[in-house]
């Protein structure tokens, strides 16, 4: 059944390493590339990943902070007095595991609950090797499919943007490995959206952090899957408003806002996590997004189509295909954008939820 297929797919991807997991997380938000069923299956990669060994994590902490041994991480780990340990306590199992690291719950000597993110051993080397393998294999696949299409007299092979997805993910992964950069990104993101009043970021503890170990305050809250329908709708609304403000007002965007990187805190604020992937938005793109939102609210689909083209959602000149299995072709007609606007209007009117607040267009 679908659940079994999804579990099998996720297990296979997790076994291929962090680059595969990150590509899977990215594709979980692209039903246009992999289909709805695959997207649903891949979503579990956002919050459920295979952890690496606790011994390796403790060893990384000991090395990063130049401790005598892993026993000096916390009293409950090695039985040493608290005065000889980095933390007052440190969980024996990870609270969460991600593609490049895992998080432990700890307590500082001044009694603060904190989250300690420890990078996977040899993460940089693994990412570099995985990406190289991906790039080489994908090039071979592209050439083989192009050759097969040429033999059949068909048009050029359309890679469906998968190659671009892999390149983008790999670039971002190298940034994610720099925890110093992530801490700076988090502070900048908090400051950029402070005016909203309902967005927060975990406070960074520099004295307990390094380039490969990141310590922040422990967030008391829940991810979307653990929330009630009412609270889930609230978090979704707050997250959408925050992301929209980033796109059209601040120009500083969290580039990986999937379910695993969002929490609703007990005080009702939405908390963003994981700031390894960030992006800056040019002013003209911000203006085009704003125009697109205004056009959508006014149901002005001609202006919305132009905004799509301005931000790059549509190519110039237009390209189209009848179905996902066909290659894109140039839509070489003088009224191509008007026809697209007409089809967009029809789709929004006939698709279930098409004109609702979080409907088909979202």
Give the location of each predicted region.
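Histidine-centered phosphotransfer motif of kinases
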Residues: 254
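Broad phosphate/nucleotide-binding scaffolds in NTP-utilizing and phosphate-metabolizing enzymes
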Residues: 1-246, 251, 259, 263-283, ...
């Amino acid at each position: 059944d679908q659940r079994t297929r999804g579990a099998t797919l996720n297990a296979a991807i997790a076994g291929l390493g962090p680059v595969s997991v990150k590509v899977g997380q990215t594709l979980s938000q692209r039903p246009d590339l992999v289909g709805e069923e695959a997207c649903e299956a891949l979503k579990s990669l956002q919050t459920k990943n295979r952890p690496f060994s606790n011994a390796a994590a403790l060893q990384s902490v000991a090395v990063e902070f130049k401790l005598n041994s892993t026993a000096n991480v916390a009293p409950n780990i090695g039985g040493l007095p608290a005065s000889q340990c980095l933390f007052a306590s440190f969980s024996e199992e990870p609270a969460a595991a991600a593609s490049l690291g895992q998080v432990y719950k700890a307590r500082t000597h001044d009694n603060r609950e904190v989250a300690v993110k420890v990078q996977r051993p040899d993460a940089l080397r693994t990412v570099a090797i995985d990406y190289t393998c991906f790039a080489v294999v994908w090039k071979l696949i592209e050439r083989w499919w192009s050759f097969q299409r040429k033999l059949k007299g068909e048009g050029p092979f359309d890679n469906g943007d998968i190659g671009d997805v892999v390149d983008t993910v790999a670039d971002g992964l190298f940034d994610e490995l720099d925890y110093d950069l992530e801490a700076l990104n988090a502070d900048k993101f908090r400051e950029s959206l402070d005016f909203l009043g309902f967005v927060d970021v975990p406070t960074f503890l520099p004295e307990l952090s390094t380039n490969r170990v990141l310590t922040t305050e422990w967030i008391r809250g829940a991810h979307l899957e653990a929330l009630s329908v009412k609270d889930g709708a609230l978090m979704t609304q707050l997250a959408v408003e925050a992301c929209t403000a980033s796109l059209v007002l601040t120009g500083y965007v969290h580039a990986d806002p999937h379910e695993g990187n969002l929490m609703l805190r007990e005080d009702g604020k939405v908390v963003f996590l994981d700031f390894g992937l960030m992006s800056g938005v040019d002013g003209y793109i911000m203006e085009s997004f704003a125009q697109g939102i205004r056009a959508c609210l006014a149901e002005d689909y001609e202006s919305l189509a132009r905004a799509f083209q301005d931000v790059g959602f549509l190519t110039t000149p237009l390209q189209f295909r009848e179905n996902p299995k066909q290659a894109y072709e140039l839509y070489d007609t003088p009224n191509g954008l008007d026809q697209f606007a007409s089809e967009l209007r029809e789709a929004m009117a006939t698709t279930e939820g098409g004109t609702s607040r979080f409907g088909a267009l979202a």
